Amino acid sequence: MDEDPEEGLLGWGETVFRDEHVFEIDYVPEVFRHRESQLQTLQYALRPAVRGSRPLNVVARGPPGTGKTTAVQKLFGELSGQPGVQTVRVNCQVDSTRYAVFSRVFEEIFDYEPPSSGISFKKLFGQVAERIADDDEVLVVALDDVNYLFYEDEAGDTLYSLLRAHETQPGAKVGVVVVSSDLELDVIEALDGRVQSVFRPEEAYFSAYDRAEITDILRDRVEVGFREGAVAEPVLDAVGGRTDEAGDLRVGIDVLRRAGLHAESRASKTVEMEDVDAVYEDAKHVHLSRTLAALSDNERALVRTVAEQEGDRAGDVYDVFNDRTDLGYTRYTEIVNKLDELGVIDAAYEQRSGRGRSRTLRLTHDSEAVLERL
C-alpha cells in the first residue's frame, strides 16, 4: 500500500499548539522550578503585609531571564487574594520617572488614570497615601527593571517618596520590591544616605540557570503549550543548549514559539530541527528587541548614529547626532551613558595617537541586527 502523502501534515483547522499563551512574556507558569530559596526570601519579606504590618523591602537582582519578574508575579498573585493588601507592579522601562511610577500606582489603586495634566506630584502622592491609609491597606510596590530609574536619576526620589509615605500620611504602610537586571549596578550603594537609611532591604539573588535547569523549564512549557508529541526530546535538548549559550531563558521560550509557528507554516504536526535553525537568529535577539523598543526617539537616533559611525570618537558622533536632533552636548552625554549602562553601546576611553585618551562609541551587537530592530 502506498504511503499517504498527507500523513504528518496539519489540516486547515489544526495547530501544533495546545496553548500558545504559554510562550508569551506575561505568562506565569503554574510550576516555577529552581527558584525555591529566592521565593522563600520574598515570602519572608512580604508575609507581614498579610498581618496588616509594613513588609520588609527586597532587592531581587540577577541576569536577564532568570525568573525575577515571574517570582514577583507569582507572589503578587497570591497576595492579591488577601484582604487588606494592594500590590502594584511597575515596569520601569515604561514608567521611568517618579511621577510616572506614582501615576501607575494611582491607576491601580483607583481603577482610573490620574488627569494627564494639571496635577502636581505632591497632590498625586497625597491622594495615593491617603487612600491606602483610609482603606487600612498595605501597599506593596514592585519596581521592575529599576535600573531604568537609575539611568534617569529618578530612583532615589522615587524610593524615598514611597518609603516615607507614613510620615506624610499617618497610617500609610508601604513596602517595596526592587528588581534589577543590571549586574554592574549596586542598587544599595547607588542610593544616597537618606534613602539607604529607610530602605534596608532583604536581598534575593537570581543566578543564571544551568543547562539542565533550562531544559527542565522548557520541558514544562512544551508539555503545557504544545500538543503531545509535537516536540521530541532531542529537539527540546537542542533548544536547551542554544538557550544556555545565549544566557537568557527568554530566548529559549521565544525559540519554541517561533519554531512552532514555522512548523505550522510547513503544515507539519511536529517541530523539527529545521524549524529551530530557521528561527534562532531572530529569537536570540529577543532581549535586544525589547531594549530598543523601550528607547525614546532621540535615544534610538543616537543608536542609529553610532551604527553608522562605528568606532568614532564621541565628539565626532555628537556632530552628526546634533545635526539630526538639535540636542545639546549635556543631554547627548546623558543618553550615551544610559545606552552604555543598558549594554546597547560600549563607550570606552581609548588612547588615540597624538590625541591622548578619548571616548570611542561602538555597538555591542551586530550592527545589522540592531538596525533591523530600530
Curated annotation (Swiss-Prot):
ATP binds at residues 66-70, 209, 221. Disruption phenotype: Not essential for normal growth. Keywords: ATP-binding, DNA replication, Nucleotide-binding. GO terms for molecular function: ATP binding. SMART domains: Cdc6_C. One of its GO terms (biological process) is DNA replication. InterPro entries: AAA_16, Cdc6_C, Cdc6_lid, ORC1/CDC6, Orc1/Cdc6_arc, P-loop_NTPase, WH-like_DNA-bd_sf, WH_DNA-bd_sf. Belongs to the CDC6/cdc18 family. PANTHER family: CELL DIVISION CONTROL PROTEIN 6 HOMOLOG, CELL DIVISION CONTROL PROTEIN 6-RELATED. Involved in regulation of DNA replication. This is ORC1-type DNA replication protein 6. It comes from Halobacterium salinarum (strain ATCC 700922 / JCM 11081 / NRC-1).
